[in-house]
Amino acid sequence: MLNHISHSQPVLDYVASLKVPVIVGPIYEAPKEDERYDAVYSLPAQLYKRGVKIVFASYSAHDVRNLPYQAGFATAFGLPYDEALKAITINAAEIWGVGDQLGSLDAGKTANVVVANGDPLDVKTDVKQVFIQGRAIPMTDRQTQLRDEYSK
């Protein structure tokens, strides 16, 4: 697999010829001075059109919450919606060799599920509940407690 692909327009055909999955990200980077304004944003779609399996990455623990938004942003620049979802679910599980255990809702797989009040790739959507290994995770923490206390 190739990792941290973000500014690779000049070599897209070569990357595709390698026939390996590509970890893209983050796509929030500004273009280089000699790139089009949408070079980084359209990269996932360009790779997909060349038959490359893609996965989005955050490269930092605090930014992992933004993976769905990276996928959503990529759909605005040509990546098909279903492929964007795969890039943050089953594709990631498959390239790490755990696709038989994680990454999709299938019988016999670990039940890791995010329940939201809308489109999971939309920044306006709120996560309502998370299940990890089939167990509901508390949706409160110190930040939500402070918010609730001081919003009264």
Give residue ranges: language-model regions:
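Catalytic beta/alpha-barrel core
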Residues: 1-8, 27, 31-33
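Polyanionic/metal-chelating signatures
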Residues: 8-11, 126, 132
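His/Asp/Glu-enriched, well-ordered alpha-helical/loop segment
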Residues: 13-116, 125, 136
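Extracellular/periplasmic ectodomains of large secreted or surface enzymes and adhesion receptors
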Residues: 49, 129-152
